Amino acid sequence: MKRLYIVSTGAGGLGYISPEAINAINESEVIVSYSKYARELGSLIKGKELFTSGMTHEIARCAQAIEYARQGKTTAILSNGDVNVYGMATLIVELMDEKDLWDEIELISLPGVTSFLAAASKAGAPVSQDFAIVSLSDRLTDINLIDKSIKFALDCEFVL
């Protein structure tokens, strides 16, 4: 079966990337990435077929990764932090659903160290109580939903 990895590269550079993510990158023929992440991981992706694009082209990158996989090329789409937390996983799953590709492509999502947890660790601020992570980006989320999420989290006294 054709394979598409959604690879978390951690909170930046090579310091937070998991061995499992490195193995997936090594196994992949094609790497799809935001240009900045590709530069940060240069030595790891050297010699691979590479598709990069700039900020705000997330949907196009996801569509291209799926297309490479459909062509039979083992593909890894990279995202910093954890792909499942404000990462590329949601977009990939939505596109896979839209095109009903679940019987055609094996999708493997690899978790990583979120930027939130890396920052908390560096600050010496362990997260030991209930907490909420609310993205303030209105790029793919309506600002009214962001406002509502913040209000509900504060009503519950979550650490934000």
Model regions: which residues?
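Class I S-adenosyl-L-methionine
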Residues: 1-110
